[in-house]
Amino acid sequence: MSDMEELDVKAKQYTPQLFLESEDKTDEARSTFNELQECTYSSKSTGSSGQHEHMTCDCYEDWDSDKQQNMACGEDSDCINRVTSVECSNKFCTCGNDCQNQRFQKKQYANVTVIQTELKGYGLRANEDISESSFIYEYIGEVIDEESFRKRMIDYDTKKLIHFYFMMLKKDSFIDATMKGSLARFCNHSCNPNAYVDKWVVGEKLRMGIFSKRNIQKGEEITFDYNVDRYGAQSQPCYCGEPNCIKWMGGKTQTDAALLLPDGISEALGVTHKQERQWLKENKHLRSKQQSDESIINEAFVKSIEVSALTESDVSKVMGALMRVQDLNITQKLIERIYLTSDDSINSSIIRVHGYKTLSQTIKAFKDEDKELISKILIILAKWPKVTRNKISSSQIEDVVKDINTNSNDDNLKKLSSDLLAEWGKLQMAYRIPKNIGNDKESNSPALYGRNARSRSRSRSPDRGKSAEPQHVETDEALPDGWQTAFDPNTQTNYYYHAELGISKWERPIKEVPKGPKGPKALPVSEPIQRPNSNSNGRSYNEEELTRREEERLKREKEEQFKEIQQKERLLQELILQSQKELEEKKSFEEKMKLEKLEKEKERQALKRKKLKKSKSSIPPAPPVPIDGQWTKTFAKHVPNFLKKYEAEIGRDNIKGCAKELVKTLVAKEMKKNPDTKPPKELDNAKLKKIKEYSKMFMDKFLIKYRSKHDKKRSHNEENGGTKRVKPDVE
């Protein structure tokens, strides 16, 4: 026996330690972090399950009146969602509200408390016995992308944080419970754990839970293997104390034992940890050559696995693993197992457990990485049994295959996808029984034609392993007008539907006046048996009574259908009226707001005008300009123009002085003649001529004085070609 095998045997024989006397430290532990009720997400896409279509099971509601609970989709059922690690939804599943497969949503956690351990800090203790495969707690924290994860790893390492709180949700999403999380963060590591982590699809998100690996006793510490999906900045010594302890946990460089496949994956691949350890022992040299230190699985081992076709018991394991796995090597092996499966009944089971939806997501995830993988998936889809196109349509896989056919450059993929689309195009949609049609009522139909009415209160999930043959009702009678029959592959029975009325039922519809039961086809001729009180009248009465009852039942059905239609129409009308009312209210509100805005604007403008008017009225009016000032202004417009020609000789300053003196003289003359007469707006030509003549006379006198005074200077300038004199006007 190898050392590894001996450790495994010791681990199995090991009696777990109980912490019944340890003090409850839950409140104290809660003070060390911020407790979250739900995971938070750094973006909308972070932590996405990748399942854009809702995964619905095919179970029926199973109401327990004593417990007042819907017991559908329980642990012992064959709910296709539960076996593939998908939680049911009240909104989309047909199993009724609040089924047993909503443990994450309802927070159905085990009874646990936090305790103080000797070497490992806080730990999580079971307060009562926990049975195998039970949901213990959800691992909650901040869901971040890979870039943020890398940054936080460095940051926490710098801050010397030694505890591990990162969990890999998927290859690009990580849960960080370092600062914010739930009590699940206190689960310690063990090399021989009593629990394991598993990823479940809940709505549009992938969530992580801790589940019991075996029966857990009251007082046991709950532990799982940190080396599966959990990360820390540095490797740490392990203090689990188990016989098979590998001494170290976490860090970038994983030990061989740390790279063992998770339980669900190894089962789906059809291998055991014992086989994997044996392979590691024999091929240890391959690890350093064929994979990097960042790998989280033994890649060489996965590639070496020789897979086989699926058995019936393998279906849920493989499909559940395929829905959650992101590693290409593992995906290739899982697809290979489905590819090797040729049994139609097993392939039908694969289709039932979300086969089309799962392969659709696999194609989307790896279409650019592995053409051979996509080719195998298309071949698998082509060989699957096809009766209707219902599941093909609901999974939206047809659009994915069309995308391959349109955009792929590979001729083989184009042909496979084209052939598959052509084959799917020939299929028809099957009419489905609407949800909750008569599920909560026993059939009111009388036991006619020698058979009992079909019970409607069926178990939500059919028993596993029972293959029911199609049940065909043998009768020569034609169906009533408007009724048609169809076969339901899920229940292997016929059902009846009326397309015009939009109703369906399990019981065969009968005409308003049903025929009596048929007798045997070939009875031997014999003497009639005489019975007391048995005559033709009595038999006729029974038939008439049955006919009357059946007519009343049909009448009630029609009345109920009519009332239902009226109710729907009334509700629709109410919705329309409500919508119209809301629209009118919205318009009215918008108009009101618009008017209020206009009124406010008017008030603002009026206030502005009022302020402006007030400011203007506060300024005193300017005093009237005196008459002499008005004459000054009038003459000042013309005199400078008359003197401009003298500027070259006497200069600008002298011109300004002459103009000022001349205007002053003219104003004095006007004021002397007519002191009360204002000047006209414009002077006439005669007036302007007089001003011009007077200006000339004034300047002639000024020039005589100016020239006389500057004779000597002017003589000097004339000798050097200097200042030129103004040519006198010729009269």
From Swiss-Prot:
Residues 110-227 form the SET domain. It is found in: Nucleus; Chromosome. Residues 460-475, 541-552, 716-731 have a biased composition (Basic and acidic residues). It catalyses: L-lysyl(36)-[histone H3] + 3 S-adenosyl-L-methionine = N(6),N(6),N(6)-trimethyl-L-lysyl(36)-[histone H3] + 3 S-adenosyl-L-homocysteine + 3 H(+). Residues 52-108 form the AWS domain. Residues 477-511 form the WW domain. Belongs to the class V-like SAM-binding methyltransferase superfamily. Histone-lysine methyltransferase family. SET2 subfamily. This is Histone-lysine N-methyltransferase, H3 lysine-36 specific. The lineage of its organism: Eukaryota, Fungi, Dikarya, Ascomycota, Saccharomycotina. The gene is SET2.
